[in-house]
Each structure stands twice: as C-alpha cells, then as structure tokens.
C-alpha cells in the first residue's frame, strides 16, 4: 500500500477521487505551512536535515531516509491497510461490522476524541520550537526535528478525518487547531500538559519518555475503535510514535549514565561542578513530567470513558488480548481512594474505571522503559 507523492498532498486514501475533499485540504495546507513557519522549529527553515519519510504503510520498507529542508517536507495522509471483515471488538456493538462512516448517534463523541488527540500534535511542536538553539549534539538536533515533522504529520492525520467525515464542523475544528497555541493565555491548547514549557533538553527527554508514552496508550486505545478510519489512522501513527519514545528512553538514559559516571569518578553526588545533572534535579524533572502525563488519562472514575467504551469508539490498551467479555457490565476493578485521610483500594465497576486501567497500564510500561 504505497503512498502517492506525485499529488500536492501525499496520501494513500485516493484523495484525487474526492475533488471536494481534496480542495478543502488544499485550502488548509497553506494555513498549516504558515503555522509551521511561524511556530515550528525556530531558524530551522534553511537546514537540510536527514529525515525519515513514510513511503509505504507496510511493515517492511515503510520509510525512506534523505536530506530535506523542513518546510519542504512532504506531510501527508496515511492510513494502515484495512483489515478484511473487521469487527467491533468491545462494547454494546461487540461483533458487529466496523463502521466505515460516522454513526450519527456518536458523531459528537467521535469528533471530540479526534479533536483532543489532534490538538496535542502541533502543541508539542510549539513547546519544543526553541530547543534547536541549545542542542547537545547534531544527533540530538536531528532526532528533535524528526519528532517535530512527525507530530506535524499526525496533525494532518486527524485533520483528514475531520475534513472527510465531519463536514463543516470538522473543517472549523481543523482551523481552530492552528488558532490555539501552547501556553497562550487567550487560546491555550486543550490539555494542560501541552501548555507547559519545554525550555531545556532534560525537559524534552522527559517529555518524549513520559508524555509521548501517554500518546502511545491513547493512540492504541483509539486504534481499537469501531470507527475504522480512526482505527487505521492511529495504527500507522503508532509506527512513528515508537521513535519518539526511543528518543526519550535513550536521552534520559544518557543523562543518568553521565551522572552515575561523575558520581563514581569524583566520589560525590554533587556533580554540578563537574558538568553533570545531580540526582535531585533528575528526580524533580521526573516527578513533574510523570505527574502531568498521568493527568492526561483523566479521572479515575469517568462516565465519559465508560460511554466511549460502551459505544465502541475507544477501547482499552491491547483490547483483543484481554481475557474477559469485552463489555464489562458486571466486572469490577480496583482503584485507589482517599477516605478518612487514608489511601486504600476500592472495588468499583470496571466500565467506569477504563481511564484508571489505561493509566495503570501506562505506569507499568513507564517502569519497564
């Protein structure tokens, strides 16, 4: 399933067969490029960067590497291959055919999920736009730019869904994604974690370790969706997301290793005089980024999350591998609660604790690294 790069907007969704949609996206494209030039990587316009570009959505040979100036990067619309006779795997529609169009009764909920996910993609680019001025190495600079262009492509993925399936409302939502800005007092990003500053490279490494890992779990749960175009979009986004977490894992690992080496060499935990980052600072950064990333999963008990699950539009992480009835009408889940100034575990309806289960899975994955 190769990608057509001869078109103005590279894609594998036969965009040329839908002239109305093609024209709408081509009108949005210059607005996106203006946003990139204004709020993308600062002073990165003329740099030739060795970037990965998707040329296929198949597992083998899906990417091409070459030098490219970032404003000339070919952002496009790529969906994973369709699964023949795919069925909805959870909720009240369990076993029914996956939807190729938006069910009218779930239109508002699906749009809200897509907008919330889509809003995070340009937000992180805005947060990281000045990091190129202080990069530890060219290797790190290249990784930063790779993450940035792929976050931009993930925005394109969500904007395609809004334009293709939500009509005028979707087009307006796509425009508003470029009007909101990270940390803007008047028009901030939807989720608070994406309004925080990323002023230095330790923040960036922690962000790609923890916050991009949240992205992995959110995308994986959306990839279970009964709305097939959303599922296919998120499945391919997960392929690109893996590199973002690699940047975080190896970045944090290098910092910690350097700290340990200096502690051993100088027999002290005060490594700042020797150019290291001390353990107290590492712990402070870890606490902050882990906390704001955990907040992204929402409340422990959530009616919205229960409704999304019951509707079949957002599942659990690795839904098909979970051994239960995939409807959760009578099952329970343990969550922490604060009662009488004490924290204890309580059994609650599992359908209402879908957020907490996803957060628990995220925490387990974060501990593994």
PLM-predicted stretches and their roles:
Residues 155, 252, 260-261, 323-325:
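Short, surface-exposed, polar/charged, turn-prone segments marking secondary-structure boundaries
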Residues 137-140, 146-176, 190-193, 202-224:
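Helix-rich catalytic cores of soluble enzyme domains
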Residues 117-125, 147-162, 179-187, 208-215, ...:
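Alpha-helical transition-metal enzyme core signature, strongest for iron centers
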Residues 67, 107-117, 136-154, 229-242:
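Alpha-helical scaffold segments that form or flank carboxylate-/histidine-based iron centers
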Residues 275-287, 291:
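C-terminal edge and immediately downstream basic/flexible tail or linker adjoining helix-turn-helix-like DNA-binding
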Residues 1-135, 139, 165-202, 286-369:
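Terminal targeting/low-complexity segments that flank the catalytic cores of oxidoreductases
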Residues 212-215, 234, 286, 359:
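Active-site-proximal structural scaffolding
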Residues 130-142, 165-166, 217-237, 251-280, ...:
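Inter-helical turn/loop segments and adjacent helix faces that build the functional surface
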